[in-house]
Amino acid sequence: MTNNTKTITLNLGPQHPATHGVLRLILEMDGEVVNNADPHIGLLHRGTEKLIEHKTYLQAIPYFDRLDYVSPMCQEHAFALAVESLLECEVPRRAQFIRVLFSELTRILNHTLNIGSQALDIGATTPLLWLFEEREKIMEFYERVSGSRMHSNYFRPGGVAEDLPDGLLEDIDKFIEQFPPKLHDIESLLNENRLWKQRLVDIGVVSQKEAMDWGFSGPMLRGSGIAWDLRKSNPYDVYDEIDFKVPIGKNGDCYDRYFVRMLEMYESIKIIKQCIEKMPKGAVKTDDPKLTPPTRAKMKESMEAMIHHFKLYTEGYDVPAGETYKAVEAPKGEFGVYLYSQGGNRPYRCRIKAPGFAHLQGLDFISKGHLMADVITIIATLDIVFGEIDR
C-alpha cells in the first residue's frame, strides 16, 4: 500500500491583516502542517537608499522616519550618529540626554504596538485597546516636541531640532509613574493565561546558534538567551552613564520573545527616569554655524542670518570625504547606517541595515513543522515592518 501525500500551496497576504504590512507569504503545506514558507518582499520598495544620494544630509532625515514607521526616532538617531562621525562634531550633553529619552519612549511605542497586535492576532482584544491608550500619550509627546505624531523629523546631526517645550519633562515623568501599573494589568491578562501559553510556548523556537548564524538581533537574539545589546556593548550618546539591565529569555520561543519585550519596557522606564533626573541645562544643537541654522529671532533682525538659513536648507553643508558605519539598538534590533562621502553636500552612498530583513529570512526555518495558525503567531513575534525591509 502506497502512501501518496499531496502538498498544497497557499498564498498568505499581501492584504491579510495578520501579515503586518505587505508580506506575501507562499506556504507549501501538508494538510495543516507547514513544509516551506517563502516570503516575497519588495511590495513597499521606494528606493530610499538611492533617493538619499540625491538629497543633502538635512533633507535625508525625513526618509528615515518612513522606514520603520512604528519607531521613527531610532532610525533618525542612527543617521545622525553616522553624519556626526564623518563631521567629527561634538553633541551638547542636553541634546544627548533628549535623544536617549526619546529613543526609549520610541522603544515603548514599538513594543506596545507589537504586544497588542500579537494578542489581537491570537484572539485577545483587550490588550490592544489598553496599550493603544498608552501609545496615544507617547504620540502626544512626539507631537509636542516635533509637531508630528509619527514622522517626527526631530533628531539632527549635532543635536536635536528644538529644545523641549515647557512642562514636557514633567508630563513624561507623570506618564512613566502611571505606566507600570498598566503593564502589570497586561501581564495579569497574558503571562499565566492558559490559551496565551498554549499558543506561544514552544512555538517558533530559535536556538542560540541559529540566532547567531542568521544574523538576528534585538529581542529575536535576546529571546534565545544571548545578552547582546548595543546600548551596553557599544554605547552611544550617554548610555554608558545610565544603569539598566538587558533582559534575556531561556528557550528562544515566542513566549520568551514576548516576555523580553515586556521586560524591556520596564528597563526603558528606568532609563527615562534617569534621563529626567540627570537632564542638564544648556544648548541642544552644536554651536558650529555651518551645521546649525540661525534662530528665528536672529532672522528677524539680520538679513545675513536669513541668507544663511536659506542656503543651509537649500544647499546643505559639506561633509568631509570618508566612510563610517553607525548602529543603534532599535526596538526591533540592530539598525545600522553605512555612509560613504566623497566630500560635498550629498552622500555618495547610504546603505541601510534593517533588523527585520534578517528576521524575515529566518521565517522559513522557524515555521517549518508548525501549524498554519502558528505561522501567524511567529510573524507577530518577529516584529516585522515592511518600511524598513523593502526600503
Curated annotation (Swiss-Prot):
Q: How does it sit in the membrane?
A: Peripheral membrane protein
Q: Which SUPFAM superfamilies match?
A: HydB/Nqo4-like
One GO cellular component term noted in the UniProt record for this chain: plasma membrane
From the Swiss-Prot or TrEMBL record, state where the protein is found: Cell inner membrane
What does the record give under GO molecular function?
NAD binding; NADH:ubiquinone reductase (non-electrogenic) activity; quinone binding
Catalytic reaction annotation: a quinone + NADH + 5 H(+)(in) = a quinol + NAD(+) + 4 H(+)(out)
Q: Which domain of life is it from?
A: Bacteria
Family matches, as Pfam families: Complex1_49kDa
Could you tell me the EC number(s) of this protein? 7.1.1.-
Q: Which InterPro entries match?
A: NADH_Q_OxRdtase_suD, NADH_UbQ_OxRdtase_49kDa_CS, NDH1_su_D/H, NiFe-Hase_large
Which keywords label this protein?
Cell inner membrane, Cell membrane, Membrane, NAD, Quinone, Translocase, Transport, Ubiquinone
Q: Can you state the subunit structure given in the record? A: NDH-1 is composed of 14 different subunits. Subunits NuoB, C, D, E, F, and G constitute the peripheral sector of the complex.
What does the UniProt function comment say about this protein? NDH-1 shuttles electrons from NADH, via FMN and iron-sulfur (Fe-S) centers, to quinones in the respiratory chain. The immediate electron acceptor for the enzyme in this species is believed to be ubiquinone. Couples the redox reaction to proton translocation (for every two electrons transferred, four hydrogen ions are translocated across the cytoplasmic membrane), and thus conserves the redox energy in a proton gradient.
Q: Which family does it belong to?
A: Belongs to the complex I 49 kDa subunit family.
- Give the protein name, as stated in the record: NADH-quinone oxidoreductase subunit D
